[in-house]
Amino acid sequence: NEVCPPGECQQYCCDLRKCKCINLSFYGLTCNCDS
């Protein structure tokens, strides 16, 4: 899981075809990707 800029989920930090952006209060937005 890579940390994304606040409020955004971009393809450079996640593959949106495989990943969902999840907002974790401590980490901010992260990419949750299927392995």
Curated annotation (Swiss-Prot):
Keywords: Disulfide bond, Secreted, Toxin. Expressed by the venom duct. The keyword Secreted applies. One of its GO terms (molecular function) is toxin activity. The keyword Manganese does not apply. One of its GO terms (cellular component) is extracellular region. Coiled coil: none annotated. Contains 4 disulfide bonds. The cysteine framework is XV (C-C-CC-C-C-C-C). It is found in: Secreted. This is Augerpeptide hheTx4.
